């Protein structure tokens, strides 16, 4: 399979991809959410591009320089997965919560500054919201901001038991609270939070299907309003590269399986990259 199709995977118009779709389609019976739940309100997705603060940009560029030195001579055949993942995670931390990367960081954080403007405006217009992040430290920072502004919220991470999650869901959907903060992996499935009509993904994840499942905590049976999904993306950084990987993966899935396809496994593309591809992933483009 890899020998025959791998080089065609990034080209959705490839004849080989068309042939692959014809091969697998007789064995797949799929009914997408859009086909089954035609009565659901609209879901509108938008990427909001955020410029790093001056201090963040300086920190980001310094670490990129260091990371490139560490990866020079990289051989994807060697078991360097943990090293690559650690480097990319640190870059993502700088984009979202620089204090997680450097506890002495005291500069501005672009996304937090944006949230300070967004949240009051969203709530004052009668909306209620879910905010997802993969970093517990980031959720804590957002939590502090909500408390400063006296915003009523619920919080869910992996430590919250199923019974308590269901209780939070019940309270929120009955009108209690204005915001639910959720770690992406803890809240990706099983929760009904149709009391929210705005979903914010504070930091992007490699696999679009995981984010879609999280967004669908609000966009599901019982939702009466259109749902707005907002992804916060720092300009020129690893986050824009993640979005590109998401889009490529989505296009491939849709070409082979059809619209709304995808699985919930984390993307492994980064572990198949060679040194040149990793250097491009690390580059700051603006």
Task: Label each residue range with its predicted role.
Residues 1, 17-20, 59-63, 168-169, ...:
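A structural signal for short hydrophobic/aromatic patches embedded in well-ordered alpha helices
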Residues 1-33, 223:
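Conserved P-loop NTPase motor "coupling/switch" region that bridges the ATPase
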Residues 2-6, 21, 88, 92, ...:
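Conserved protein kinase catalytic domain
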Residues 5, 27-28, 64, 95, ...:
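Hydrophobic aliphatic residues
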Residues 8-13, 70-78, 264-265:
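Short, polar/flexible loop-turn hinges at active-site or ligand-entry regions and domain interfaces
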Residues 19, 23, 27, 59, ...:
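Generic recognition of well-ordered alpha-helical segments
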Residues 35-61, 74-191, 261-262, 268-286:
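Conserved Helicase C-terminal RecA-like lobe
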Residues 37-65, 164, 179-265:
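SF2 helicase/translocase ATPase core recognition
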């Amino acid at each position: 399979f890899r020998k025959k199709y791998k080089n065609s995977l990034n080209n959705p118009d490839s004849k080989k991809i068309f042939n692959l779709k014809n091969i697998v389609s007789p064995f797949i019976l799929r009914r997408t959410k859009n086909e089954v739940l035609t009565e659901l309100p609209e879901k509108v997705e938008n990427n909001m591009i955020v410029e790093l603060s001056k201090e963040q940009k300086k920190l980001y560029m310094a670490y990129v320089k260091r990371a490139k030195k560490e990866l020079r001579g990289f051989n994807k055949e060697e078991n360097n997965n943990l090293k690559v993942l650690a480097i990319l995670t640190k870059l993502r931390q700088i984009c979202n919560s620089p204090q997680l990367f450097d506890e002495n960081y005291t500069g501005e954080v672009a996304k937090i500054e944006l949230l300070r403007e967004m949240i009051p405006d969203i709530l004052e217009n009668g909306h209620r919201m879910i905010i997802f992040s993969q970093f517990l430290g980031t959720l804590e920072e957002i939590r502090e901001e909500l408390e400063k502004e006296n915003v009523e919220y619920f919080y869910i991470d992996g430590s919250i038991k199923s019974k308590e999650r269901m209780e939070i869901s019940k309270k929120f959907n009955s009108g209690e609270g204005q915001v639910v903060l959720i770690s992406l992996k803890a809240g990706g499935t099983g929760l009904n939070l149709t009391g929210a009509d705005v979903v914010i993904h504070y930091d992007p994840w490699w696999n679009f299907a995981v984010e879609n499942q999280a967004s669908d905590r609000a966009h599901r049976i019982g939702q009466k309003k259109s749902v707005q999904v907002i992804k916060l993306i720092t300009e020129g950084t690893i986050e824009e590269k993640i979005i590109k990987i998401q889009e490529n993966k989505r296009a491939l899935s849709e070409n082979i399986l059809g619209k709304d396809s995808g699985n919930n496994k984390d993307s492994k593309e980064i572990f198949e990259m060679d040194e040149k591809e990793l250097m491009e992933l690390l580059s700051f483009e603006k």
